[in-house]
Amino acid sequence: MTGSRLQPAEIEGAWICTPRIFGDDRGSFLEWFREEDLSAVLGYPPDVAQANWSVSRRGVIRGVHFADVPPGQAKYVSCVRGAVLDVIVDIRDGSRSYGRWQAVRLDDVDRRAVFLSEGLGHAFMALSDQATVMYLCSTGYAPGREHGVHPLDPALGIAWPSGAEPVLSGKDAAAPTLDEARRAGLLPGYGDCQAFTERRRAEHGRARQGRPGEVSLPGR
């Protein structure tokens, strides 16, 4: 992205984008999403199959959500109105950072965005009324492949902001703890996530080799 910074998060497989905002007396402009920048860090172009829009009042928590891998569901998340505390959770069984989380404030001032690769858990808490979150998803809605972990699981210990009573959907309130989800075999395996990523990179490499006008030379 022109003038934007795409930095790896503390959790492997996630990135934080801080865009450069161009402002004048008319308003402002920024590049919110640019495929080639994510392709450069992922090693393959990200898929976009569905765009979601959610509006939440202050205190609402959505998540922790994740999907079976493969194919999983990568997400590119931004808050276009108000503010949320966005949380990346490593729920990949076997990962060195399993059970860890990172919180990032997303709002309509800095306009930052977060990308989460397939296999990571995602949640956020609305810090303002009418907090509006827009996110791109690599796969469409498939309820049979989607799961959750309770966002208030004390063992997970996400430090949600105080001052607002957490508001959860019935589904999220009934979600298992991280340990319960692990014992039930619901969590994606770190090895499966890595294999999925490597397969995507290999497919992209083969597709590039087969582009018209490009010649693969022997021994190269």
Each model region followed by its residue ranges:
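Extended, polar beta-sheet/loop recognition surfaces of beta-rich domains
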Residues: 135-137, 143
